[in-house]
Curated annotation (Swiss-Prot):
Glycosylation site list: 50
Side of membrane Cytoplasmic, spans: 333-462
Species annotation: Drosophila melanogaster
Presence of keyword NAD: no
A Gene Ontology term for the protein's cellular component: acetylcholine-gated channel complex
UniProt name for this protein: Acetylcholine receptor subunit beta-like 2
GO molecular function terms noted in the UniProt entry: acetylcholine-gated monoatomic cation-selective channel activity; transmembrane signaling receptor activity
Length: 519
């Protein structure tokens, strides 16, 4: 029995030792430094020796990503690192007293930090996104670079959309302290100058697929507000951006230009097809769809009409005019002698002058030859009677010789015209034949007039074809070429300064790391 008791003792003793808490001691010098610095530290008091002393805060921005530039809501969304630096005399120490510790990382909630906010904020979130740790140096210098996603209000200029350039401002300053208490300066500011040409750090910037950044200057300002005795200092960052136009050119401009030049084909379509007005209305409906699409993109402002809106309006006016002119051309095309008479001026202008100007050649329309010397009043001349009788049978011809000779003599005395001494059946047949011939002759003359009206409509179609073609070409160039960004040859600064390459689905390592891997 005692064997089992001894075995249990040997098993329980190691188990008890294994469950005992194990303590690890941190860096004692760092812990002691942290306790000494922050034990009696008040983070609510501005860190100056004298209350009248001005605390200088150096401010800078590092742009990580241009998330969105919303024209409709007029807001710019950016991902930034807000770099801040200042001196806190209460956070100084001697490294020799703390084991050579020269740098310490502390939560930013435990020390005094300047209340730097974005003045022109859009969504109400004025502060930084994440309260990261601050870096303390033994000299009392404090570094703090919290990340933030800001939505800043930006007045967009849509006059030259989609070939536009936008200028947005980001105004940072202390919300509580005036310029006599906290003086803001840019990290790269030169003494005696308030302007920094490259005011935003773009070394960690991910290139945007929609915008090119041209300029990023920063300016220090001092401004008086109502009921304040001292000015408040702020730093205003200016972002000048130029839109990359490939997407809008392919998806908006090219289809719109194609619809514009479809208007020209209306006048090339023959009038007899009956589809001219249908084509015009179809183009007009397509332009209306483009207008609805544009209304979803641009902001509802009455200050300026965007470039694309001007072009769509110009195209819609052309299509409306094409509908009007097409109706007029069709009206002329289907005119007839019974409803309209062609005036000599119209005949001379559209049948002789303008065809030469429009380089048109008309096929000559010739009427059949008719004998206009035959009266149409039921009488005939001597030659007609002789020809008629010569065609009759010989019996009838012989029986009529005497009467014919007497009638012939009388006809000479009465304007060479005699009554027809033919049978009623023959006379009726002759009248019917002459009526048919006269009807065909009148129909041919009417057809000639109808063809003249059709040719006038063809001349008008050719004239409007050239007129609308020139209008489309010069109108397109005149409207689109208004944009100043088409003539801006400045190289994007983000491509020059960014150290993050943009490649197609490839991540490129820095050259020094590549060399280390290869060696």
């Amino acid at each position: 029995m005692w064997h089992w008791s001894l075995l249990c003792v040997f098993l329980l003793v190691p188990l008890a030792n294994s469950t005992a808490p194990i303590s690890f001691e941190a860096n004692p010098d760092t812990k002691r430094l942290y306790d000494d610095l922050l034990s009696n530290y008040n983070r609510l008091i501005r860190p100056v020796v004298n209350n009248t002393e001005t605390l200088t805060v150096w401010l800078g921005l590092k742009l990580s990503q241009l998330i969105e530039v919303n024209l409709k809501n007029q807001v710019m969304t950016t991902n930034l690192w807000v770099k801040q630096r200042w001196f806190d005399y209460k956070l100084r120490w001697d490294p020799e007293e703390y084991g050579g510790v020269e740098q310490l990382y502390v939560p930013s909630e435990h020390i005094w930090v300047p209340d730097i906010v974005l003045y022109n904020n859009w969504d109400g979130n004025y502060e930084v996104t994440l309260m990261t740790k601050a870096t303390l140096k033994y000299t009392g210098e404090v570094f703090w670079e919290p990340p933030a996603i800001y939505k800043s209000s930006c007045e967009m200029n849509v006059e030259y959309f989609p070939y536009d350039e936008q200028i947005c401002f980001m105004k940072f300053g202390s919300w509580t302290y005036n310029g006599a208490q906290v003086d803001l300066k840019h990290l790269d500011q030169i003494p005696g100058s308030n302007l920094v040409q490259v005011g935003i750090d773009l070394t960690e910037f991910y290139l945007s697929v929609e915008w090119d950044i041209l300029e990023v200057p920063a300016t220090k300002n001092e401004e008086y507000y109502p009921d304040t005795l001292e000015p408040f200092s702020d730093i205003t960052f200016k972002l000048t951006m130029r839109r990359k136009t490939l997407f809008y050119t392919v998806n908006l401009i090219v289809p719109c230009v194609a619809l514009t030049f479809l208007t020209v084909l209306v006048f090339y379509l023959p009038s007899d097809s009956g589809e001219k007005v249908t084509l015009c209305i179809s183009i007009l409906v397509s332009l209306t769809v483009f207008f609805l699409l544009l209304a979803e993109i641009i902001p509802p402002t009455s200050l300026a009409v965007p470039l694309l809106g001007k072009y769509l309006l110009f195209t819609m006016i052309l299509v409306s005019l094409s509908v009007w002119t097409t109706v007029c051309v069709l009206n002329i095309h289907f005119r007839s002698p019974s409803t309209h008479n062609m005036s000599p001026l119209v005949r001379k202008l559209f049948l002789h002058f303008m065809p030469k100007l429009m380089m048109m050649r008309r096929t000559q329309y010739t009427l059949p030859d008719y004998d206009d010397s035959t009266p149409s009043n039921g009488y005939t001349n001597e030659i007609d009677v002789r020809d008629s009788i010569s065609d009759f049978p010989s019996e009838f011809k012989d029986s009529q010789d005497g009467a014919y000779d007497n009638g012939m003599q009388n006809s000479v005395d009465s304007d060479n015209v005699i009554p027809r001494n033919l049978t009623p059946e023959v006379l009726q047949a002759l009248r019917a034949v002459r009526f048919i011939a006269q009807h065909i002759k009148d129909a041919d003359k009417d057809n000639e007039i109808v063809e003249d009206w059709k040719f006038v409509s063809m001349v008008l179609d050719r004239f409007f074809l050239w007129l609308f073609t020139l209008s489309c070409v010069f109108g397109t160039l005149a409207i689109i070429c208004q944009s100043p960004s088409l003539y801006d040859t400045r190289s994007p600064i983000d491509r020059q300064l960014s150290e993050i390459p943009l490649r197609k689905n490839n991540f490129m390592l820095p050259p020094d790391i590549v060399r280390q891997v290869l060696t």
